[in-house]
Design a protein with these regions (language model features):
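Intrinsically disordered, low-complexity regions enriched for glutamine and histidine
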Residues: 13-16, 37, 162
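Bacterial Sec-dependent N-terminal signal peptides
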Residues: 24-53
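N-terminal secretory signal peptides that target proteins for export/translocation
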Residues: 1-15
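Gram-negative bacterial Sec-dependent N-terminal signal peptides
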Residues: 9, 16-29
Length: 261
């Protein structure tokens, strides 16, 4: 992996067919990709208890923007699939791109003497499960109502295909961000919520939610400028996570940008 000190975060454009690239500071990319959230104690999702087979073929092979071959379940393998088209900013190798002219100022604004802290791991941290979990569901997954308590005006309305036992970041008793991430593999849709609580009637309550189109560069067609999302920055969470199925391939297995905070 290369560390580019003047790399980027992305913010969604409204009604557009592209992403606006905002140079905001230091980010990490692999030669062809990478992915994780670096804010403690929110590292990437741990490996499944019974890992599915990693995607076939050599690292570098893969299917972009079509997740129909993904396995089902919590922490399931995508079997070589990647969210969004190959031309998407999340999947673009920027290792040969010129450094932004404002690189030094951006780095100084973040903190020149501050490093990056990787939060990889599995198991428990202070009694709570480590990582940001996700679950892959089929297109037949029942859709349920989601009540948004804080950012309804900036959320994509339900229903969402959320299983009642969908994994919650930090576990059911967590007092943290409580993200829920669900991938509908058959419809190529990503559903993300924050401060998520299952309700007795099968519905969910969350502070806000976003639906991303994994088969398009118009990743969130409903979004307006400055809208938030489950990560509070207008970005999807899932595309930047490091997953077991890709990391297990070794060098070259991660082919997307890394997420960190």
């Amino acid at each position: 992996m290369r560390i580019l000190l003047s790399t980027f975060l992305w913010r969604l454009c409204s009604q557009g067919s592209r992403l606006a690239l905002l140079c905001l500071g230091a980010a990490v990319v692999a030669c062809g990709g990478g992915g994780a959230d670096g804010q403690a104690p929110d590292p990437v999702a741990p490996a499944p208890a019974t890992p599915s087979n990693p995607p076939g073929g050599a690292p570098g092979n893969g299917t972009y923007g079509n997740l129909s071959a993904a396995a089902l379940g919590v922490g399931a393998s995508l079997n070589g699939a990647l969210p969004f088209p190959a031309s998407n900013a999340w999947n673009t190798n920027i290792s040969t791109q010129p450094v932004d002219p404002n690189s030094d100022a951006l780095i100084a604004g973040i903190g020149l003497d501050r490093g990056l802290h990787p939060d990889f791991g599995a198991g428990l941290y202070q009694g709570q499960p480590i990582g940001i979990p996700y679950v892959v569901v089929a297109g037949t997954q029942a859709r349920v109502a989601v009540q948004f308590t804080d950012y309804a005006s900036e959320s994509d309305p339900g229903p969402y295909p959320f299983p009642h036992n969908a994994p919650i970041e930090g576990g059911p008793a967590s007092s943290g961000d409580r993200h829920v991430i669900v991938i509908d593999r058959d419809n190529n849709r990503l559903y993300e919520t924050g401060n998520s609580y299952p309700q007795p009637d099968g519905s969910w309550r969350a502070s806000g939610g976003a639906v991303f189109h994994l088969d398009s560069n118009n990743v969130r067609p409903t979004a307006q400028p400055r809208w938030t999302s489950a990560d509070a920055a207008g970005l999807p969470i899932f595309p930047g996570l490091v997953r077991y199925d890709e990391a297990s391939l070794g060098p070259g297995g991660i082919r997307h940008a890394l997420r960190f905070t």
